[in-house]
């Protein structure tokens, strides 16, 4: 398995080549070709390694070189290759390859074309360092690296004030989560004396419950920021200011899923604390539902999909909190495919409509863009959870599991499923079919995207149709990494501890076979209920936005307080502005007045005024009379004698 080093370093080499020679020798399209080759090589190596693990069930911990020495403890740049990291690596590299190909068409003519592909390659390298790490230090390096690359790519068009502000917001909000994450790493090192995953797992049974809970919650704080969960979610919708391939790669398929992956990677730690699992479950649940309500009333095509990403990440975290780690990771895999498809489809629409974002100004472009329309429909059906598309096989099991484990979680995830189906088909009908709102000049020039943009759409759409039927394979494939009974690297006492933590899901039976699950969903009450909910959401969107039997404006007026709540994103931004921006400004003004004007200026100005006053008083004693001078000398002698006698 020595070839595995190629996986992370191939994109790094592409980044270095483009960074050094891009503007001089590798201008469009050569820099794009170099980037595609770099990530494609990683994808091929990932698939080969994936097949090897699937055949043997083994895991490999490769130490590439010693990186940091802290006393007797050494941190290595490493590659942990097991089913979990192999799956995540394949997701990152394969989806990235098609996004890179799409980007060669999307970014055509951009004056900063080489810089864009250099940043993309840097991001993939950092994401792979995060994914392949066997220790928390390398994980943190990749964690911060993807944050840096995300900042650079969100603000890629930095001459736009909105893009620059969005990049800064993303960077600052993520620092809050990263601060918690770093505290968790430090506490883990103090507790275990190591940051290697396998060594941490081996020592779990001997650590106090409160300490494990604190470590897990601090690490999860980092995941909340990186994966844009409530309350650190506000940066993700504004991150859509970056080019659309960035949204597809970073804010759908890879970086925002890093938090979900981290929780799965450290599953034994989280499973050792019921409080930590409950926190993950409830944060994910509320994020899934609240983000879905926000997506209902947005009109920006990319922001609608962004809110759906935030919501689906909530489903993944809810699954992990429920103890359904394999189902959560399978949903991560399927979501990466169909959400990348939806973002790239929106990018195809934006190119055709000269970057018009408002879906209320679109419509009737379906016939002019048949490939984009058809593939976008497939992605929408997958997101809504309609069989036989992959979203049905990955999302519905989470809702069914919640039904058996926690009623509160089930109700919110079930409600979120209805809202998801509604808002994605609201977007679909408004964009491709409904009405005649499109500007006539734009309508004349609408055409299908070129092959380097449509071929990735077709490939991702095909994967969206096919992938769900491999559900059983993926669930079984992940067992050596996520099922304590199959985790060879865990000692028996830790296996017992982890199994007890996951006991909440022991009584849950979810059909692993895709065809059996489909049959179950079409015959059981719960399966029919969940499927009918998705169909109801699609039907309502059709009635309101296609045939217009219900007026959306009247509905908004009837429920205006709720509409305003959703439209203003539950006022999270307003509250944060009032506290952290306006509040900080007012506090600064108070501190300025008290500290600068009253104290500092008071001392400086007061000493000057005091000197003037004292000089005036003393000046009155200088009258030029001998009697006055004698009196002053007498007073001086008295003071001197008094001090002498006192000190003696």
Go through the PLM ranges and name each one.
Residues 446, 488-494, 498:
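Acidic, turn-prone loop/beta-hairpin segments
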Residues 596:
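Alpha-helical polar/charged "hotspots" used for coordination or helix-helix interfaces
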Residues 580:
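Glycine-rich and polybasic anion-binding loops at the starts of cofactor/ligand-binding domains
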Residues 477-492:
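Membrane-proximal cytoplasmic C-terminal regulatory module of class A 7TM GPCRs
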Residues 556-566:
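Short, highly charged, low-complexity non-transmembrane loops/tails of multi-pass membrane proteins
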Residues 1-476, 500-551, 564-570, 574, ...:
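...captures the hydrophobic TM-helix bundle architecture rather than a specific catalytic motif
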